[in-house]
Amino acid sequence: MSKLKKPILESNCVADKLCDSLNMEDNNNDKPDTINVDLGSPITPLQTQPSGLSSSTSSFSSSSSGSVTGHAGHTPPVTRKPDSVQPVPSASKSKSSNLSSAAKSSKSSTTPSSAAQFGGSYSPARAQSRASSQVGAKTGNIIRPSSNSASVTTKPSGNKSSVSSKQSLKILPAGNLVPSGKVQITGMTQEKPRSMVLGPGAKSYGYGSIIRGNNLSPVKPTMMSDSSSVLPLTLSNNSTGGPDAYTSWKIAIYGSNPEEVKRFGNEMFRKGCFAEALKLYDRAIELSPSNATYHSNRAAALSSLGQIGEAVNECEIAIKLDPNFARAHHRLASLLLRLGYVDNAGIHLYSVEEPLDPTVVKMLQQVDKHLNKCTYARRRGEWSIVLTEVSAAIASGADSSPQLAMCKAEALLKLLRLDDAQRVLECVPKVEPFPASFSHTRFFDMIAEAYTSFVKSQMELALGRFENAVVTAEKASKIDPQNNEVEILYKNVRLITRARDRGNDLYELERYTEARSAYAEGLKYDPSNATLLCYRADCFFKVGMWESSIEDCNHALLILPSYTKPRLQRAALYTKLERWAEAVSDYEILRKELPYDKEIAESLFHAQVALKKSRGEVVLNMEFGGEVEEISSLEELKAALTRPGVSVVHFFRASDPQCKEISTFVDALCVRYPSLHFLKVEIVKCPEVGNAERVRVVPTFKIYKLGIRMKEIVCPSKEALEKTVRHYGL
């Protein structure tokens, strides 16, 4: 029994020490383990251990924000709640309370702080028993305070204090450094530094609108919704973003000061974040719609995003709000210059007395010079000069002009480079919405929008889309009814379409001569129409005028090289005239454009056979449309390789996945290249063939010509295999 009483007495003794450490009377000031703590200092001294305790002794971690206030001679009941790992200041009121508490503690240098008093030593046995009975207590090498709060109530009882816990007390071993909440202990906490951010301005923080960043989100106005896709913005140097950056962005986008919102927008614009800058400028305009600067800045953001038309409209609004706003005039001049409106750009550039940007002035002069040369060359029909000058004007700065792109397409069309004209037409800049104030600006003596429809109508006509050509020509005529060029085009398009319709009707009635005359009537108005030339070539073919048909096909292909119909017609004509080399050349081009057309493949095969015969080559046992032939013996393989022509032998294993995949492609090659012999050998079924050919890896391809091996490929890709087959098969 005596052995059991000793630790109990020791435990009670330590408990008394613990209770004494919680006593707030003045007579406790002389305790050797009590240290005064300056709450304004980020440093808390470590506690010394009594010699009677082991190294596992633990200590409490407490707040220093004035949760327990000491008074000489009397200690009132105080309820204390420990802070979480990351304290969150909810309002300026709590901040002032913290500051006042810190001030009180610093005034009395002899009064021990609660944080120091809670750091008194105690018995490990009692600590472990108490910790095991409480929920949320943690032990270990690294300790983190529990999220649950605990309350400690201290009541005066002579020289002792009683401790009651409503929730779990944090029993922490000595020697482990634990964040104490609001008392920042150097080296013990690794919190991220909080940056200075701009406050929303709704309250007074004592230092203007600059506050410490925190995890609190500002109050959201009901008029706007949160957008998590927006790039966060922060005033700090912390590039990692985080809650402070997000808070700064929210403060900016939901702020009530338009100048601050504009300033944030300018910062985003300088960083190249034009979409985010645009949203901030929109917010500034919402707060102050009559500010010309905000509209001008919004125009700059829109211009950087490629929305030229809307940027022009914003500049016009800014100028209406402030007619003497030089920046808006210069910005509008630059935008109009990009659209090719040189005269209007010059008006705005020289409308203010501000110093002009020499770069913009030089750009304006260059574009104006090239456009003047382009206009004169177009009137004379010198389309090569037109193409050169309009390209130079675009390169000089008018890079967003739909009309200049249309002029380039028109020049290529007149130079019979229809394929190039199509590519240019696909890349015409789109200006939406089109500035209404410049809708009647003229290009080449034509209203800008009418000129766009004018060129489109010519392109539709050249591509054989006659109905679309009529519609676009009619649209141009309605926009600019006084223009002579537009009226002539509209008239010619209707006549050409009528001639095409009449020729098609006669062709269906097999009245080929009359149909040919109808097509010729349409060619009077458009001599370079590839569609009408092809139709007339077909009529020549039907009546046996093969040479005339070839001439029309040549002319059509010169204008539009990608036109399939005249090439197919010409290949058939070459076959009729037994011009096998030209026929094979045309059919090979058609095979590339239409690889799965069996009629073209068969025509190519027969043309190749005829070409070989014309050269004196032996062409025995050559059949079109054969399948891949399976070889079952070595003698069968030798017999197959003695055939004239090229043979492709595929060595494979049926169970191999790669062989299965490539076998499907070999079947397709057999259809694409019917003049070649395709053979396959399963090396598991025919091991003697594989051994004789020394096949060790599958799939393996060997190409033979007249029994002589030309090439061997092991595990090729589909592209490499087809390239090799095409090389040796043609």
Swiss-Prot record:
<feature type="repeat" description="TPR 2">
    <location>
        <begin position="293"/>
        <end position="325"/>
    </location>
</feature>
<feature type="compositionally biased region" description="Low complexity">
    <location>
        <begin position="45"/>
        <end position="67"/>
    </location>
</feature>
<keyword id="KW-0802">TPR repeat</keyword>
<feature type="repeat" description="TPR 4">
    <location>
        <begin position="448"/>
        <end position="483"/>
    </location>
</feature>
<feature type="compositionally biased region" description="Low complexity">
    <location>
        <begin position="125"/>
        <end position="134"/>
    </location>
</feature>
<dbReference type="GO" id="GO:0006950">
    <property type="term" value="P:response to stress"/>
</dbReference>
<feature type="repeat" description="TPR 3">
    <location>
        <begin position="327"/>
        <end position="359"/>
    </location>
</feature>
<feature type="region of interest" description="Disordered">
    <location>
        <begin position="23"/>
        <end position="168"/>
    </location>
</feature>
<dbReference type="InterPro" id="IPR013766">
    <property type="entry name" value="Thioredoxin_domain"/>
</dbReference>
<dbReference type="InterPro" id="IPR036249">
    <property type="entry name" value="Thioredoxin-like_sf"/>
</dbReference>
<dbReference type="Pfam" id="PF00085">
    <property type="entry name" value="Thioredoxin"/>
</dbReference>
<keyword id="KW-0677">Repeat</keyword>
<dbReference type="Pfam" id="PF13432">
    <property type="entry name" value="TPR_16"/>
</dbReference>
<feature type="domain" description="Thioredoxin">
    <location>
        <begin position="636"/>
        <end position="722"/>
    </location>
</feature>
<dbReference type="InterPro" id="IPR011990">
    <property type="entry name" value="TPR-like_helical_dom_sf"/>
</dbReference>
<dbReference type="InterPro" id="IPR019734">
    <property type="entry name" value="TPR_rpt"/>
</dbReference>
<feature type="repeat" description="TPR 5">
    <location>
        <begin position="496"/>
        <end position="529"/>
    </location>
</feature>
<feature type="repeat" description="TPR 7">
    <location>
        <begin position="565"/>
        <end position="600"/>
    </location>
</feature>
<feature type="compositionally biased region" description="Low complexity">
    <location>
        <begin position="155"/>
        <end position="168"/>
    </location>
</feature>
<feature type="compositionally biased region" description="Polar residues">
    <location>
        <begin position="144"/>
        <end position="154"/>
    </location>
</feature>
<dbReference type="InterPro" id="IPR044534">
    <property type="entry name" value="TTL1-4"/>
</dbReference>
<protein>
    <recommendedName>
        <fullName>TPR repeat-containing thioredoxin TTL2</fullName>
    </recommendedName>
</protein>
<dbReference type="Pfam" id="PF13414">
    <property type="entry name" value="TPR_11"/>
</dbReference>
<comment type="function">
    <text>Plays a role in the transmission of male gametophyte.</text>
</comment>
<feature type="compositionally biased region" description="Low complexity">
    <location>
        <begin position="90"/>
        <end position="116"/>
    </location>
</feature>
<feature type="repeat" description="TPR 6">
    <location>
        <begin position="531"/>
        <end position="563"/>
    </location>
</feature>
<feature type="repeat" description="TPR 1">
    <location>
        <begin position="258"/>
        <end position="291"/>
    </location>
</feature>
